[in-house]
Amino acid sequence: WFLEYSTSECHFYNGTQRVRLLERYFYNLEENLRFDSDVGEFRAVTELGRPDAENWNSQPEFLEQRRAAVDTYCRHNYEILDKFLVPRRVEPTVTVYPTKTQPLEHHNLLVCSVSDFYPGNIEVRWFRNGKEEKTGIVSTGLVRNGDWTFQTLVMLETVPQSGEVYTCQVEHPSLTDPVTVEWKAQSTSAQNKMLSGVGGFVLGLLFLGAGLFIYFRNQKGQSGLQPTGLLS
């Protein structure tokens, strides 16, 4: 037995401003022939596809028909789907965190997690103290969630110094303005001081609440007592 099939892919850039049609032909799961509208003719991927490529390229009418499919197939279907898929916009959720909880001035990987967004075209940039980082950036690329939304991780390799501010900036068609999320590099002592301050504040609130509770309870008890020593 054998398996022979083909696929048609429409690639859109900036709406329908630029459209690329890619038709791929397979034999037993191996691609042997393709038509690329950017090339304008059939090209053999393996020797098995060479006879078909030569045959179809020698037929001007058939070749012109495949070139026109950019409009008759791709742009035509885009206009149909435009009513549902293209206008759909889902804003991304952005979070920033380090992969390791370790002292500063050690190699670390900062992660900018961008999730649950649609469409898939998105731009994620890293900044350190307001200056864009161009090197040390690793990305997972787009990952499909299976519900018409996407996610991606864009990581920055760095050695954080105390006081530095790292910013992940995300631009997406669903956003009127870029979203920025900051991560501030703090020493262990600074983190401990901050946690102590927060803990003291919470403890103070607890004591205040307990004091108010006792005060109002006593006030209620006193208001319920009957006056004594009055002559009738």
From Swiss-Prot:
Glycans are attached at residue 14. It is a single-pass type I membrane protein. One of its GO terms (biological process) is adaptive immune response. Residues 1-90 are annotated as: Beta-1. Residues 1-193 are extracellular. It holds the Pfam family C1-set. Its main location: membrane. GO terms for cellular component: MHC class II protein complex. Keywords: Adaptive immunity, Disulfide bond, Glycoprotein, Immunity, Membrane, MHC II, Transmembrane, Transmembrane helix, Ubl conjugation. It is found in: Membrane. Residues 217-232 are cytoplasmic. The chain crosses the membrane at residues 194-216. Residues 91-193 are annotated as: Beta-2. SMART domains: IGc1, MHC_II_beta. Ubiquitinated in immature dendritic cells leading to down-regulation of MHC class II. Disulfide bonds join 10-74, 112-168. This is H-2 class II histocompatibility antigen, E-S beta chain. It comes from Mus musculus (Mouse).
